[in-house]
């Protein structure tokens, strides 16, 4: 048991490095362990026992903060994908869409978030809790940002006034996830820009700029 009395059910002592609050250190270690295990073997590899072993904590410590391994896995993914969705001020709707789609491609191809997303998306098909967390924590906030871009473009006259926001969001981002999961074609910045260009060709207003 650790010095603070929160050792796990396996009686294991928990690792600690100086200079960080114990709770923050443990949470980060758990989330990183969950992410590493999912990259290596999917959600089935990220059991509470395996996460605890890799993080150097007891299972009771994990259950104190998360109800299931799916919840740990999702937060571990969010940790890896932090600060991946921002826009500069004053850009057009067209440029904002390009920035967002290129950012998604970079995240999935240049960081561990790509393998993690593949694992989470696969396991979410048979795990309702994980699927809900994926929608609520990852997809919904990002769709909200992009939807605001589209609404602004429609209001300014850059994009069509009768724009179907939800369908357009699917047209813009679904190709990225399709290539990430199935790997049938290159997932790179050139593809991201081509995708946005094709969508923009159909949603710009007659007076809208490039």
Label the predicted regions.
Residues 1-56, 71:
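Basic, helix-initiating cap at the start of DNA-binding domains
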Residues 1-15, 99, 140, 144, ...:
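C-terminal peripheral helix-coil segments that are non-catalytic and often amphipathic
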Residues 75, 85-117, 168:
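Hydrophobic alpha-helical connector segments
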Residues 56-66:
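Short hydrophobic/aromatic patch on the recognition helix
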Residues 102-109, 117-126, 196-202:
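Helix-loop "lid/cap" segments that line or gate small-molecule binding pockets
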Residues 65-66, 134, 138, 177-178:
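Tryptophan-centric aromatic hotspots in well-structured domains and transmembrane helices
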Residues 30, 45, 68-73, 83-84, ...:
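Short amphipathic alpha-helical segment with a characteristic S/N-K-E followed by hydrophobic residues
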Residues 109, 115, 129-155:
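Amphipathic alpha-helical packing segments from all-alpha helical-bundle domains
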